[in-house]
Amino acid sequence: MGDKGRSLKINKNMEEFTKVEEEMDVRRGPWTVEEDLELINYIASHGEGRWNSLARCAELKRTGKSCRLRWLNYLRPDVRRGNITLEEQLLILELHTRWGNRWSKIAQYLPGRTDNEIKNYWRTRVQKHAKQLKCDVNSQQFKDTMKYLWMPRLVERIQAASIGSVSMSSCVTTSSDQFVINNNNTNNVDNLALMSNPNGYITPDNSSVAVSPVSDLTECQVSSEVWKIGQDENLVDPKMTSPNYMDNSSGLLNGDFTKMQDQSDLNWFENINGMVPNYSDSFWNIGNDEDFWLLQQHQQVHDNGSF
């Protein structure tokens, strides 16, 4: 082996040693507030780039992949946090019937929501409920239950929430030296904190407002519109129309299934204490025995060719 060959081998071994050394020094586990601040400040100054290089330059003992996921899923200013709203639930169910598990495509129509968040919602809520019912989430039976029962019930809840919000003020005023923090943002850092420092940097000393996990402000206005995706799938900002799932003429609910709903006389949104929870995921608090009965009845109607 010549001198050149030995030199290349030594360099390769050194690179491998450095890589192993860096991996041993990589930090695992939850991100700290200080790490979040360092990542946000670095991206504010230099922008996004190659994440492995960014992690080294920002002096973060994290992998490039960890930095990328932390930024995209939690720290980006436009990321929306908090429970999936009723309107978002309806849209997810609607889009999934068209596109299946194409989470990135679905996320395009839910501003501020990441594909990972939507996927987790589907798996922890919809798939879990289908499993409890011993029903395949991809079966026609389960799809019909969503289309003819749960989605109309969601519409009812959205309309009820809209009516209940009429008496509430639709706006919040603050003095010029106050910041309004959306209660959906539960990140360590809120992008509004950037405004509190004329240099655009965040430090532990000036981030007391930013790291507040919950705001005292609550959403005062609930949209009265229930949106349905338009037919043009190529639109970046899709044309949205207001659906009417309760309209029998549309074929979504026929007379037999409406009678079946009336006979059930169920309150689909009560929890075990008989109280309606004040969070949006209460939609899935449905009694299993009642679901089984409806699934069986619906399957009989479907088998008889009434749909």
UniProtKB/Swiss-Prot annotation:
Chief location of this protein within or outside the cell: nucleus
Any one GO cellular component localisation term in the record: nucleus
Biological processes, Gene Ontology terms: response to abscisic acid; response to salt
Domain spans labelled HTH myb-type: 23-79, 80-130
MF (Gene Ontology): DNA-binding transcription factor activity; transcription cis-regulatory region binding
UniProt gene name: MYB78
Annotated compartments: Nucleus
Induction, per UniProt: By salt (NaCl).
Keyword Membrane set for record: no
Keywords: DNA-binding, Nucleus, Repeat, Transcription, Transcription regulation
DNA-binding region: 51-75, 103-126
Name listed for the protein in its UniProt record: Transcription factor MYB78
Keyword Transcription regulation: yes
